[in-house]
Amino acid sequence: MGNMPKDFLWGGALAAHQFEGGWNQGGKGPSVVDVMTAGAHGVPRKITDTIEENEFYPNHEAIDFYHRYKEDIALFAEMGLKCLRTSIGWSRIFPKGDEAEPNEAGLQFYDDVFDELLKHGIEPVITLSHFEMPLHLAREYGGFRNRKVVDFFVNFAEACFTRYKDKVKYWMTFNEINNQMDVNNPLFLWTNSGVVVGENENAKEVMYQTAHHELVASALAVAKGKDINPEFQIGAMVSHVPIYPFSSNPEDVMLAEEEMRQRYFFPDVQVRGYYPSYALKEFEREGYNITFEDGDDEILRNGTVDYLGFSYYMSTTVKSDVKNDNTGDIVNGGLPNGVENPYITSSDWGWAIDPTGLRYTLNRFYDRYQIPLFIVENGFGAVDTLEEDGKVHDPERIQYLKSHIEALKKAVTYDGVDLIGYTPWGIIDIVSFTTGEMKKRYGMIYVDRDNEGNGSMKRYKKDSFEWYKNVIQTNGEEL
């Protein structure tokens, strides 16, 4: 195989709400995640009406990057990161979301963080909305089901683009915008969009109306960003779990093809600038009444993205003659026809380990869209043990990352995919999004904090730290 591009961005990925802490400091308002309690594997997180005294909210303090950012960025620099993907906490900039003017203390915090990154030669890659909508917009406006929230988001995007136009080049509008396709789990519509579905509402219809507003908001933000700095690279970001047919039975093959439309819907609109015909047919068939305003077509057309960012953790498989009752089961990918793939193994959390699926995904996306791609999440969640000598041995994580880097290298050097970079998820241990746990760790830096919020917060390098440092130094030559 040939060499990786010299300017390939090896990095790490995080989200403000999962690692910053300082949830009510510097003028920050509460976000939709600040009312989410701790859960566990198989125990869903609760969304409370207010901040309740007897509940534990793990994101409030998280790993306290808010006060430790210099120390943490120094560790990222020691690892040799070329970029750091993180997000700007929306409610840090607009505490309620509907203010006319941004919160200066919040803006200054990100100035300090970006300056510190750039001082160490680390390029910031920034997500505008990573499950951090101001709680006020969700409670008072109904989140993105309300068209007014489009304007609030664009106002927030403009404030960020203007303030950081000389510090940030790579942006993404919404993180994993397609998570909310899973309407069976209320966590996703709430965190993606600040939306709660009423008892008598059609969840899918609510989701598509909400999605339309977000797609319009994304397109308006892209156009606004290009006005502010034409050099900006503004991308979309989706969660991607490729779906394989269980067999060569044509029914299985066609079912996988149909199910993949759920995966492609959002990027189809954000990359191409118009609704795919299969989606319009679905609205018609199901009788969904989605309100499109005059001019929306033009907005979508004029706000297409420059690149596609995506998360990849696993693949899933479907079989046409199977019907699952438990669509919440991760093994079947939450799909009614999902089955276990006999050719691949799974992690302790039931996530299929499939590096070839990453190469497959890169090829499918690149064939479909012909724009640069960016792997902005990938990684291995596991329970790690801090030894008495301060070491953490994580050979499974190294093996997982190694096999996935081999797959992406092949996609670039053999298949010819245009790939901007690779940012493994949770480069330092953070609060898990789905469960609120600390126990499920992705990092190459261990943080001494447990599920109940106890611990010294001290940072320790895992074995994977030195391993990844060498991968970056050799531009992926030595795995």
From Swiss-Prot:
<dbReference type="InterPro" id="IPR018120">
    <property type="entry name" value="Glyco_hydro_1_AS"/>
</dbReference>
<comment type="function">
    <text>Catalyzes the hydrolysis of aryl-phospho-beta-D-glucosides such as 4-methylumbelliferyl-phospho-beta-D-glucopyranoside (MUG-P), phosphoarbutin and phosphosalicin. Plays a major role in the utilization of arbutin or salicin as the sole carbon source. BglA and BglH are the major proteins contributing to hydrolysis of MUG-P by extracts of late-exponential-phase or stationary-phase B.subtilis cells.</text>
</comment>
<dbReference type="GO" id="GO:0016052">
    <property type="term" value="P:carbohydrate catabolic process"/>
</dbReference>
<dbReference type="GO" id="GO:0008706">
    <property type="term" value="F:6-phospho-beta-glucosidase activity"/>
</dbReference>
<feature type="active site" description="Nucleophile">
    <location>
        <position position="377"/>
    </location>
</feature>
<dbReference type="InterPro" id="IPR001360">
    <property type="entry name" value="Glyco_hydro_1"/>
</dbReference>
<keyword id="KW-0119">Carbohydrate metabolism</keyword>
<protein>
    <recommendedName>
        <fullName>Aryl-phospho-beta-D-glucosidase BglA</fullName>
        <ecNumber>3.2.1.86</ecNumber>
    </recommendedName>
</protein>
<dbReference type="GO" id="GO:0005829">
    <property type="term" value="C:cytosol"/>
</dbReference>
<keyword id="KW-0326">Glycosidase</keyword>
<comment type="similarity">
    <text>Belongs to the glycosyl hydrolase 1 family.</text>
</comment>
<dbReference type="InterPro" id="IPR017853">
    <property type="entry name" value="Glycoside_hydrolase_SF"/>
</dbReference>
<dbReference type="Pfam" id="PF00232">
    <property type="entry name" value="Glyco_hydro_1"/>
</dbReference>
<dbReference type="GO" id="GO:0008422">
    <property type="term" value="F:beta-glucosidase activity"/>
</dbReference>
<feature type="active site" description="Proton donor">
    <location>
        <position position="176"/>
    </location>
</feature>
<dbReference type="InterPro" id="IPR033132">
    <property type="entry name" value="Glyco_hydro_1_N_CS"/>
</dbReference>
<keyword id="KW-0378">Hydrolase</keyword>
